[in-house]
Amino acid sequence: MAAVAAATRWHLLLVLSAAGLGVTGAPQPPNILLLLMDDMGWGDLGVYGEPSRETPNLDRMAAEGMLFPSFYAANPLCSPSRAALLTGRLPIRTGFYTTNGHARNAYTPQEIVGGIPDPEHLLPELLKGAGYASKIVGKWHLGHRPQFHPLKHGFDEWFGSPNCHFGPYDNRARPNIPVYRDWEMVGRFYEEFPINLKTGESNLTQIYLQEALDFIKRQQATHHPFFLYWAIDATHAPVYASRAFLGTSQRGRYGDAVREIDDSVGRIVGLLRDLKIAGNTFVFFTSDNGAALVSAPKQGGSNGPFLCGKQTTFEGGMREPAIAWWPGHIPAGQVSHQLGSVMDLFTTSLSLAGLEPPSDRAIDGLDLLPAMLQGRLTERPIFYYRGNTLMAATLGQYKAHFWTWTNSWEEFRQGVDFCPGQNVSGVTTHSQEEHTKLPLIFHLGRDPGERFPLSFASTEYLDALRKITLVVQQHQESLVPGQPQLNVCNPAVMNWAPPGCEKLGKCLTPPESVPEKCSWPH
């Protein structure tokens, strides 16, 4: 590993030197664009086999860059996965989990009291050490209260929202969610930023696109490196698209949203080419978790051959589309079978900037540059957590399930189904089933749909079990969980009076403060 890292650093030094020198003669590190989608599935892109082939720009990105077919979210739900991307650490370490029930998914609704803890070092904070200017466009989702604001955690600019575009609300029992520019709100969803739930029309993706284009143009003129985290939420239900894209897809409204995203990515990449900075800009496209099959077929995407979707620790819940693009550096048209994670984007971005990850804490993200630049593969596990429960682990081609659960029988009988049409006897369960003594093990190469567990008596099973058990033991013995952030809710902390509401005349009166345990049903 040391030799690989040294070789990668040497290669990167040559790359940076070739990319351009600043006035002092020091090489300038590349710009970094992380494009994070919301609830987009592995099977939603043409390059991943989506039959309508309506993503020409993303497909071209893959043809000019590198595809990662085995790339994972850090959690099957939005907030924990986003915290992991920006810290390089599993959500169990940063406190993005709940202990209010066994194996419960949790996130950051308006009433959540917690958020990203101050001791965590976020990627934009660290990139400042290499002179990067940074902006987040879109969904933050790491806490609503003022102390969790993204500009307090390293970002220089923000246009977007602390949550998804849920609503509309009546502003009495629950306020509509604010949209911020930097420190202050500039309106609310369904008010200044309309979304027509009947037609699906909203101009939000175009607004987010323009924010990205304007930032890139401004930063290019400064000749300093920049970091853009473009975290839009268009494919999260309720799905929306602008008028020009509505009705243009063979896949309905969800496909319209995907087409608009594809067009937006094409325009961003086109601008990089026009400004002649494509060769000095690293771009990575992925999603925060699997497609929400519970919203399908009209409001949910495709997870391809994989089982179930968002909220579950089956492959469909956590395996993501992933494309790396860096012309002249990442060889074109390549497929990497490196097991990757959104946490790797933290470590890889630091490596691109010539920085080391913090040494005072466990970092779970790998540097993907050896895989991207040299085709080298690093063996590493993928851990699948639901709350503070380790549900499964993958090593190589083998995945072991220690617990299985989709969602409760009560919810299922009410029509909530995270695996519609995909029931696998003994695998997809509506009660929490423990397999810690004899895990269910699947070979994901032969059986990506997790339908045929290996025989407990087979040599293949025993060999895979031995290797995975060792890795899991090492992980659990050294694990120091963070203080849980997603246990306490309080209606008084919702977005009643965000900063800037006075200027707009949009301050609302909060209710009495009543802290209580958050209820997480699945």
Curated annotation (Swiss-Prot):
Region span, Catalytic domain: 27-379
Post-translational modification: The conversion to 3-oxoalanine (also known as C-formylglycine, FGly), of a serine or cysteine residue in prokaryotes and of a cysteine residue in eukaryotes, is critical for catalytic activity.
Chief localization: other
Disulfides per UniProt: C308-C419, C489-C518, C501-C507
Binding residue positions for Ca(2+): D38, D39, C78, D288, N289
UniProt subcellular location: Lysosome
Record-listed E.C. numbers: 3.1.6.4
Catalytic residue positions: C78, H141
Gene3D superfamilies for the chain: 3.30.1120.10, Alkaline Phosphatase, subunit A
Catalytic EC class: hydrolase
Cofactors (names): Ca(2+)
Catalyzed reactions per annotation: Hydrolysis of the 6-sulfate groups of the N-acetyl-D-galactosamine 6-sulfate units of chondroitin sulfate and of the D-galactose 6-sulfate units of keratan sulfate
Signal peptide (residue range): 1-25
Cellular component annotations (GO), alphabetically ordered: lysosome
Glycosylation sites: N203, N423
Record text on cofactor binding: Binds 1 Ca(2+) ion per subunit.
MF GO annotations: arylsulfatase activity; metal ion binding; N-acetylgalactosamine-6-sulfatase activity
CDD domains, sorted: GALNS (cd16157)
Subunit structure: Homodimer.
Entry similarity comment: Belongs to the sulfatase family.
Cross-referenced PANTHER family: ARYLSULFATASE FAMILY MEMBER, N-ACETYLGALACTOSAMINE-6-SULFATASE
Protein name listed in UniProt: N-acetylgalactosamine-6-sulfatase
Native source organism of the sequence: Sus scrofa
